[in-house]
Design a protein with these regions (language model features):
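Conserved acetyl-CoA-binding loop-helix of GNAT-fold acetyltransferases
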Residues: 88, 94-107, 129-133
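A short, internal acetyl-CoA/4′-phosphopantetheine-binding micro-motif in the GNAT/acyltransferase core
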Residues: 61-63, 86-93, 120-122
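Conserved GNAT acetyl-CoA-binding A-motif
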Residues: 109-120
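A short beta-loop-alpha structural element at the N-terminal edge
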Residues: 5-20
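Terminal substrate-recognition subdomain of acyl/acetyltransferases
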Residues: 119, 148-167
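Conserved GNAT-fold acetyl-CoA-binding loop/helix
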Residues: 23-49, 57
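Conserved active-site alpha-helix within GNAT-family acetyltransferase domains
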Residues: 99-100, 122-140, 145
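Conserved beta-strand in the GNAT
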Residues: 61, 67-75, 82-87
Length: 167
């Protein structure tokens, strides 16, 4: 059973706490891939504040009591949404907070969004499994420098069932 989680939009007043959460959460990814220069670890407070003020970005946070324990960011582009900077405090991972945030972002998407994309390190097996469990399907891999990313997609468009008799 997941403990109480208050999910709401992150504001610029939360930026310092969000920056701390992301750095704590992404340091294990950086260590796993041997790259301390991944964007969640190099983003400055000023850059984060500017990102939180963007009209095409929604960032949700999950608070357990007074503590920010998770966050998820989505960039809106036409009919596509791209998830990113998905983080849960390392000491609370595996307790359902990430799943709740992943599901909570969908109602914040504007009408007309047809697909949601996410990318993660190809070797991040737990991340890929979480996304797959919630309907995200692997589409392709892409290499950037020494890292290879897996890109996953979830369609939000209802497709009619095709029956053998209809062909």
């Amino acid at each position: 059973m997941t403990a109480d989680l208050d999910i709401r939009q992150v504001t610029t007043a939360d930026a310092g706490e969000l920056l701390t959460l992301r750095r704590a959460a992404f340091v294990t990814e950086a260590q796993h891939y041997g790259d301390p220069n991944i964007p969640p670890l190099t983003q400055t407070l000023d850059e984060l504040v500017a990102d939180l003020q963007r009209e095409d970005v929604v960032t949700l946070g999950g608070w357990h009591g007074p503590r920010l324990v998770g966050s998820i960011r989505v960039l809106i582009e036409d009919k596509k949404a791209t998830l990113g900077r998905f983080a849960v405090a390392p000491d609370l991972q595996g307790q359902g907070f990430g799943t709740r945030l992943l599901l909570a972002i969908l109602p914040y998407l504007p009408d007309g969004i047809e697909e949601v994309w996410v990318f993660t390190g190809r070797d991040s097996v737990q991340n890929i499994a979480l996304y797959a469990k919630h309907g995200y399907e692997h589409q392709h891999d892409q290499t950037a420098g020494d890292l290879t990313y897996a890109f996953l997609r979830k369609s939000l468009v209802e497709t009619p069932d095709v029956h053998e008799d209809d062909r």
